[in-house]
Amino acid sequence: MSSETGPVAVDPTLRRRIEPHEFEVFFDPRELRKETCLLYEINWGGRHSVWRHTSQNTSNHVEVNFLEKFTTERYFRPNTRCSITWFLSWSPCGECSRAITEFLSRHPYVTLFIYIARLYHHTDQRNRQGLRDLISSGVTIQIMTEQEYCYCWRNFVNYPPSNEAYWPRYPHLWVKLYVLELYCIILGLPPCLKILRRKQPQLTFFTITLQTCHYQRIPPHLLWATGLK
């Protein structure tokens, strides 16, 4: 719903919208912000109505907070089919992936889709294996693209009046680099993306190093998208 006065003031499906600057700093794929932000929506039983909410790290990771809270909500029905979509600023760590996998095994009627802005410590084998385990358990994991950023802006952000169509358009290259690395994780290949951060001055460097196995198993169109083929 387009609005010249910003988002609808009273949205019964959304508990809290985040501010534009929060969305920009949390979901910028170039930033290595420590905190994690979760935007999520829940659809029960194939209904058209969707329940939306936002969450950030507390003493636990946002994924664990969600799982603990989800099963205690009054609307939770363990025998009703439920579709959950997460938009995460960081991918789940290995421990969170294990908690999610265990949760899904206990609740077979739940389907989970995860869109991520960045890969969390992607060279850590525990995190890489955790993502593969999630996919093996039926979770769909994708890097956020322009479509997801635009969707989140319209549905989760307290955007300024007449700015419904605006969202922080990040360079496509960073998105493509994460897409390439996620593909390596899924295939069980060594990391090809390296991220270096200097404190003085504060700069972040993204580099790609490909081995023979990468050229052999990664589809050419993914390499072309990053200018590597």
Curated annotation (Swiss-Prot):
Matching Pfam families, A to Z?
APOBEC4_like (PF18774)
Task: List the subcellular locations.
Answer: Cytoplasm; Nucleus
Q: Where is the active site?
A: 63
Q: Which metal ions or organic cofactors does this protein require, according to UniProt?
A: Zn(2+)
State the CDD domains in the record: cytidine_deaminase (cd01283)
**Location, primary (coarse class):** cytoplasm
* GO biological process, any: establishment of localization in cell
What reactions does this protein catalyze?
A: a cytidine in mRNA + H2O + H(+) = a uridine in mRNA + NH4(+); cytidine(6666) in apoB mRNA + H2O + H(+) = uridine(6666) in apoB mRNA + NH4(+)
Question: What GO MF terms are annotated?
Answer: cytidine deaminase activity; mRNA 3'-UTR AU-rich region binding; zinc ion binding
- Could you tell me in which tissues this protein is expressed? Expressed in the spleen. Expressed at lower level in the kidney, testis, lung, brain and liver.
Boundaries of every CMP/dCMP-type deaminase domain copy: 10-134
**Residues annotated to bind Zn(2+):** 61, 93, 96
Q: State the name under which the record lists this protein.
A: C->U-editing enzyme APOBEC-1
Q: Which organism is it from?
A: Mus musculus
